[in-house]
């Protein structure tokens, strides 16, 4: 699967699982994405897809590397659709 396609799928999943934050931007917790069954089946490497989307300035989140458990409460914020 190519990276652009995975990033597009990630945006769709953020729309499905996320909600508007105080700034009016769509966001979802990393733990919600990571523990979702559909996401687990869609993404072989969720963290890699998140990093690719962040490099493309489609999403943002604090930190560089997200780890299950440790970073479950980190907000993944959608910057563009």
Swiss-Prot record:
It comes from Bos taurus. The keyword Ion transport does not apply. Pfam families: Costars. It comes from the Eukaryota. This is Costars family protein ABRACL. Belongs to the costars family. Keywords: Acetylation. The modification N-acetylmethionine is found at residue 1. Coiled coil: none annotated.
